[in-house]
Amino acid sequence: MKRTYQPSKRKRKKVHGFRTRMSTKNGRRVLASRRRKGRKVLSA
């Protein structure tokens, strides 16, 4: 059976990257909540 996680740098950036997060209102909300929580890493 194929595993669910098939790593790809391109996909990772496209789906979870900082610029992608910044491009939508909800994405900015995600970053804001992670800043508020004090995450060391905000996005992939």
UniProtKB/Swiss-Prot annotation:
Which Pfam family, giving just one, matches this sequence?
Ribosomal_L34
Name one molecular function that GO assigns to this entry.
Answer: structural constituent of ribosome
Q: Which domain of life is it from?
A: Bacteria
Please list where the region (Disordered) is annotated: 1-44
What the entry lists under InterPro entries is as follows: Ribosomal_bL34, Ribosomal_bL34_CS
Listed GO CC annotations: ribonucleoprotein complex; ribosome
Sorted alphabetically, the Gene Ontology BP terms of this entry are: translation
Bias (Basic residues)? 1-19, 26-44
The keyword Disulfide bond is annotated on this UniProt entry: no
Keywords per UniProt: Ribonucleoprotein, Ribosomal protein
List each coiled-coil range.
none
The entry assigns this protein to a family as follows: Belongs to the bacterial ribosomal protein bL34 family.
List, alphabetically, the NCBIfam families matched: rpmH_bact
Q: What is this protein called?
A: Large ribosomal subunit protein bL34
The protein's organism comes out as Listeria monocytogenes serovar 1/2a (strain ATCC BAA-679 / EGD-e)
Q: Gene of origin?
A: rpmH
